[in-house]
A protein has these predicted regions:
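Hydrophobic face of amphipathic alpha-helices that form TPR/SEL1-like repeat modules
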Residues: 41-51, 56-57, 66, 81-88, ...
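Mid-chain, structured segments of secreted extracytoplasmic proteins
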Residues: 65-109
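Short coil/turn and helix-start
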Residues: 53-58, 72, 90-94, 112, ...
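Bacterial N-terminal signal peptides that target proteins for export
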Residues: 1-9
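TPR/TPR-like (Sel1-like) alpha-helical repeat modules
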Residues: 93-113, 122, 137-145
Length: 147
């Protein structure tokens, strides 16, 4: 099983910044400019904790907490990173259901990421018991920002 390497994290940051500039996460007009800037700063802080850079002591737990707060606000880049953290068990307990949920929400909110995430989602789906698949599909269908 792969791990989140610094190169992967750097690539995710670049993709996330590009996404946020081209797609105005989470939705145009949903937040004012100050809120968007704060969310970008929070994302950058989460990446700093994840990698132990920019004066931050490495803390995957703190990174997961920050990504979680942004993911709940519907930021697809944070949903993607949180899904990866659940997939790898970095900063959170490894959990295929939650990894699949957050990666699926990231794809739903930013279809441009679908190709990058699809193989990992398929791997996760094979790990989820059939009786739990319906539950996770329902979570995804009913999920709303802030829930």
């Amino acid at each position: 099983m792969s791990t989140l390497t610094p190169a992967m994290a750097t690539m995710a940051v670049a993709l996330s910044l590009f996404t946020s500039l081209t797609q105005a996460e989470p939705r145009p007009g949903q937040y004012n400019n100050d809120t968007a800037q704060q969310s970008i700063a929070t994302y950058q802080e989460a990446m700093s904790y994840l990698l132990g850079r920019n004066g931050k002591v490495k803390s995957e737990e703190k990174a997961a907490e920050l990504f979680q707060s942004l993911a709940e606000q519907n930021w697809s880049s944070a949903q993607q990173m949180l899904g990866y953290l659940y997939y790898e068990g970095k900063g959170v307990e490894k959990n295929a259901l939650l990894a699949y949920k957050w990666l699926s929400l990231a794809v739903r909110n930013n279809p441009r990421t679908a190709e990058d995430i699809q193989s990992r989602r398929q791997q996760l789906l094979s790990q989820i018991p059939p009786d739990s698949r319906q539950q996770v599909d329902q979570w995804i269908a009913e999920w709303q920002p802030g829930s």
